[in-house]
Amino acid sequence: MTAKLILLRHGESEWNSKNLFTGWVDVDLNEKGEGEARHAADLLKQENLLPDIVHTSLLRRAIHTAYLALDGCDRHWIPVHRSWRLNERHYGALQGLNKAETKEKYGNDQFMAWRRSYDVRPPDLDRDSEFSQFHDPRYADIPASERPVAECLKDVVARMVPYFTSDIAADLKDGKTVLVAAHGNSLRALVKHLDEISDEDIAGLNIPTGIPLFYELDDNLKPVTRGGRYLDPEAAAAGAKAVANQGNK
């Protein structure tokens, strides 16, 4: 019997539409993003992929997306687990900056290294910055020495994969249909793990907002079909292209 895993990046946020680096800054969905989350629910219903349990981050844009998707599926009553390990990548001192302006200031090579390389972190964010979450009470359980002030994708993999192995995998092995409502980079990290994508090739993977990505997994939780299947392939392709072009004005 195959396990069913649904990955859903949050709908468009207020800062996505402004082309800003968001990271751990807790912005909400905009009107378009709310519509994307409701459309995700329609796609799940059409495929009869009704979640039994949800794993999401501590950020409202992912939590809000999960709520709207579940409400649209009439599954608002199922358990929802929240973990900082599913948070977006912490973009350090880039948080709050416009992507196109950052690219123009630092050049395309540095911009792409910060944005898409596997192991290059952006500059650290000052702990007292208006865009810092270092003193946010929701992260009080993370030891101060481990609380990120900047992350690369490698760091996201290091925090996310243990959560997948310990928590999400247990639900999949119990036969539950699992929805992971998260973020572009935490989902890139998970897809990298599932599909065994190389450190070099992961740079080319872009996750669109609001389109469910469905994986069937075998008894070893390996994908039956590498790359999974988007429930709206055309919209996913267009969305991924838009993500790739975010450094452009």
UniProtKB/Swiss-Prot annotation:
Pathway linked to the protein: Carbohydrate degradation; glycolysis; pyruvate from D-glyceraldehyde 3-phosphate: step 3/5
Alphabetical list of InterPro entries matching this protein: His_Pase_superF_clade-1, His_PPase_superfam, PG/BPGM_mutase_AS, Phosphogly_mut1
Protein family membership: Belongs to the phosphoglycerate mutase family. BPG-dependent PGAM subfamily.
Highest taxon in the source lineage: Bacteria
Listed name of the protein: 2,3-bisphosphoglycerate-dependent phosphoglycerate mutase
The keyword Transmembrane helix belongs to this UniProt entry's keyword annotation: no
Catalytic activity: (2R)-2-phosphoglycerate = (2R)-3-phosphoglycerate
Site (Transition state stabilizer): H183
Catalytic residues identified in the record: H10 (tele-phosphohistidine intermediate), E88 (proton donor/acceptor)
Name of the gene: gpmA
Residues annotated to bind substrate: 9-16, 22-23, 61, 88-91, 99, 115-116, 184-185
EC class of the enzyme, as a word: isomerase
Keywords of this entry: Gluconeogenesis, Glycolysis, Isomerase
SMART domains: PGAM
Leader peptide range in chain numbering: none
E.C. numbers: 5.4.2.11
Function recorded in the entry: Catalyzes the interconversion of 2-phosphoglycerate and 3-phosphoglycerate.
GO BP of this protein: gluconeogenesis; glycolytic process
One Gene Ontology MF term: phosphoglycerate mutase activity
